[in-house]
Amino acid sequence: MDLKQFIRDIPDFPQKGIIFRDITPLLKDSRAFREAIDRMCDLVSDRDFDLVVAPEARGFILGAAMAYKLGKGFVPVRKPGKLPYRTVYEEYQLEYGTEQLHIHEDAIERGQKVLIVDDVLATGGTAEALIRLVKKLGGEVSALAFLVELSYLNPRKRLEGYDIKTLIVY
């Protein structure tokens, strides 16, 4: 199944000059969604990890489904003020400002191996902040898995030295 056909291009969103890769048609189609999760799990089947860490919002959808299928724990990473317990955070740059990612301070035990999952690898800024959060808590990043990679933004350069798995590449 060609999963790329389920990704909708939205020009000039969230701002002029950006083509947004909308995964909601893929999520709506049960066969495509199942295929995407199965194939993303296959991409990391040879990696050793204890937890799946994923940011809101679309990262939750993919990360939680993968954690369930692989029999791993799931750790949510959220925007400020959304987690009820004490958190640590990292700031990162967006094309249009600065954002923060928060994780519970006890979410990852020292030495635990982590798979980071998100929907789209664009500039690598979010992934870089997630890596810093995992390391801040004493975890080790085993690999990163993404449904979509925007290779024309050259995100792998920013994440050099990490094992990056992607299903759909633009």
Swiss-Prot record:
Keyword Metal-binding: no
Listed CDD domains: PRTases_typeI
Enzyme Commission number, as recorded: 2.4.2.7
GO cellular component: cytoplasm
Keywords per UniProt: Cytoplasm, Glycosyltransferase, Purine salvage, Transferase
Catalyzed reactions per annotation: AMP + diphosphate = 5-phospho-alpha-D-ribose 1-diphosphate + adenine
Biological process (GO), any one: adenine salvage
GO molecular function: adenine binding; adenine phosphoribosyltransferase activity; AMP binding
Record-linked PROSITE patterns: PUR_PYR_PR_TRANSFER
Functional pathway: Purine metabolism; AMP biosynthesis via salvage pathway; AMP from adenine: step 1/1
Domain of life, source organism: Bacteria
Subcellular location: Cytoplasm
Entry keyword annotation includes Phosphoprotein: no
General function of this protein: Catalyzes a salvage reaction resulting in the formation of AMP, that is energically less costly than de novo synthesis.
Record note on quaternary structure: Homodimer.
Family under the similarity heading: Belongs to the purine/pyrimidine phosphoribosyltransferase family.
PANTHER family linked: ADENINE PHOSPHORIBOSYLTRANSFERASE
Protein name: Adenine phosphoribosyltransferase
